[in-house]
């Protein structure tokens, strides 16, 4: 099968759109015609080298939605014509983590950065004689995807494609950071640091969970304004600027929950985040740091004495097969904002402009639409 795809040939290079060849589906595999792909910051981490790929060139993209057009042998959960949301977190339903309700940690996740197919390890994507890797075993920046059945979640066919795409990564991750990992409760004061595609959804997750105050922190005024539309009650440009007013409005208690969702996580952000976290409070680290980032500084004495905790968070600590349908149901009922997340749509050929707009702070979420 022929397909267009956005390829990254090395660290620091631009995406190049070219024609590729995709093999037919093997057992347990499906072919998906992409309808919408989300432009997540994690793909930018691959460009900058903060997230190292095991092989170049690679097909970018891990957030998206599409229609099943072909299935391989032994596929039982979907059939041609089904609409699906892509899941960069696979869910086999058989490993220890899946059967104990923690499919976010499915053992298949160890294969996310493998070069070959998740199913049998073969190379199935090619540019001429050159084999191609794929971002998170997906590669949604392409007209067609060949993926494991375990990496798609069937959804209702009348839902708009952009909504189905957005819940496959950014929305689930941000919402879950507040609801599942931070465990925001009614009456809480919540701080979200970094208002991009993930942070904005942590804001609305905290609002939906009943937070009394939601403080959004971002240096970009446009993003602070958008945060107010999604449920923020206060905004500031930095944690340092927020500290004084936060102490005043909480009578010195500070934030019950702090969620870190900046574009790039840095170790030096931990202590300022703990400084605005209340006694017994929780600091959730969702943002991706460079794989080479080896240190985080904190006052370990005060950390222990104030009984605070730091939690890592992947995909909002949720369950893709449960969360994706649940979030789409909330969207259908008007409880979750998805349409308002899309700042601008692009063609595949405009992918580099889309990522430049993201770097310039112009987008909450850009999406690529396909014919």
Residue ranges and their predicted role:
Residues 1, 240-241, 257, 271-275, ...:
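C-terminal hydrophobic helical "lid"/dimerization subdomain
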Residues 88-150:
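Cysteine-cluster motifs in flexible loop/terminal segments that predominantly coordinate metals
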Residues 263-335, 370-371:
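Glycine-rich phosphate-binding loop and adjacent beta-alpha segment
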Residues 4, 16, 21, 33, ...:
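Residues located in well-ordered beta-strands
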Residues 143-144, 150-152, 156-244:
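Mid-domain Rossmann-like dinucleotide-binding core that forms the NAD(H)/NADP(H) cofactor-binding site
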Residues 22-37, 50-99, 104, 112, ...:
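Glycine-rich beta-strand-centered segment in the early N-terminal region that forms part
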Residues 242-252:
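Short amphipathic alpha-helix with an adjacent loop that forms part of the alpha/beta core around
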């Amino acid at each position: 099968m022929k397909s267009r795809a956005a390829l990254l040939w090395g660290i620091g290079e631009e995406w190049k759109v070219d024609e590729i060849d995709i093999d037919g589906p093997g057992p347990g595999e499906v072919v998906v015609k992409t309808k919408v792909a989300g432009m997540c910051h994690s793909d930018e981490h691959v460009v900058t080298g903060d997230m190292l790929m095991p092989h170049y060139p690679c097909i970018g993209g891990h957030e998206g939605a599409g229609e099943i057009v072909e299935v391989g042998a032994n596929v039982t959960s979907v059939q041609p014509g089904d609409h699906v949301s892509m899941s960069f977190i696979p869910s086999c339903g058989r490993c220890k983590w899946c059967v104990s309700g923690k499919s976010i940690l499915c053992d298949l996740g160890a294969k996310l950065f493998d070069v070959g197919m998740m199913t049998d390890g073969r190379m199935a994507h090619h540019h001429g004689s050159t084999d191609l890797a794929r971002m998170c075993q997906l590669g949604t920046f392409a007209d067609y995807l060949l993926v494991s059945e375990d990496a798609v979640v069937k959804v209702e066919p009348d839902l708009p494609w952009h909504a189905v795409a957005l819940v496959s990564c950014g929305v689930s991750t941000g919402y879950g950071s507040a609801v599942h990992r931070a465990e925001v409760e009614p009456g809480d004061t919540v701080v979200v640091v970094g208002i991009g595609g993930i942070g904005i959804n942590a804001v609305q997750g905290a609002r939906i969970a009943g937070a009394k105050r939601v403080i959004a922190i971002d240096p970009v005024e446009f993003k602070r304004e958008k945060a107010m539309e999604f449920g923020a009650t206060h905004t500031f440009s930095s944690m340092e600027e927020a500290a004084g007013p936060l102490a005043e409005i909480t009578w010195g208690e500070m934030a019950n929950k702090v969620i870190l969702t900046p574009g790039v996580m840095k170790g030096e952000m931990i202590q300022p985040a703990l400084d605005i976290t209340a006694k017994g409070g929780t600091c959730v680290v969702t943002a991706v740091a460079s794989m080479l980032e080896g240190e985080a500084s904190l006052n370990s004495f005060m950390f222990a004495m104030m009984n605070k905790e730091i939690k890592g968070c992947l995909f909002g600590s949720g369950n893709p097969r449960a969360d994706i349908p649940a979030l789409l149901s909330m969207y259908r009922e008007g409880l979750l904002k998805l349409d308002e997340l899309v700042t601008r749509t692009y063609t595949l050929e405009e992918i580099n402009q889309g990522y430049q707009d993201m770097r310039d702070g112009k987008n909450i979420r850009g999406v690529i639409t396909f014919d």
